[in-house]
């Protein structure tokens, strides 16, 4: 049935669904049940059943969310999925905070929101240098010089489960229902929107370098820094002059 939600929730869900469409489902907010199967954030979860995972893979369930702008209501046209806004809520919150701070007269600020960084204005007239890291040891990949915008990083460093000594990271590839394995260790995205940076850092991590480059050519809505599994780095054209590898 239909659920009427408040405007900000409605806008968040609608924007997320649009980003799911643009990324062909590499970013997908309808993976809640898959994340639950893996048990991220719980103590010693059992290994999920491979048949159950297969059944859940590649569903593109975001297509089953219908929006009614007039009543700000949302309708799920099919069951079998639950929402997980983990890859987007932080970025959206940063967007709200950004507009609140600007309305309050703030002209220069840096807010670090655990992996997502919002920058407003310059630092005494100078651009800011932001450290980009890639893993749980906070290995420095390099520094990015920015004026203002959002920087979000996705990697499997801090959220994972272990089975038989193997780490399974929390970033799920919706096409397989297994953790993403695209040759990328970490992906940082810089754009004018917190939601876009947050969602695309996850999407690019899932898509891998080649598809990310294609997406960049096609839409050009965000810049990226990809750290490959071997530690080498790929930087999008728009920020290559502003990035200094360490």
Specify the residue positions occupied by each region the protein language model found:
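Mature catalytic core of soluble alpha/beta enzymes
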Residues: 1-246
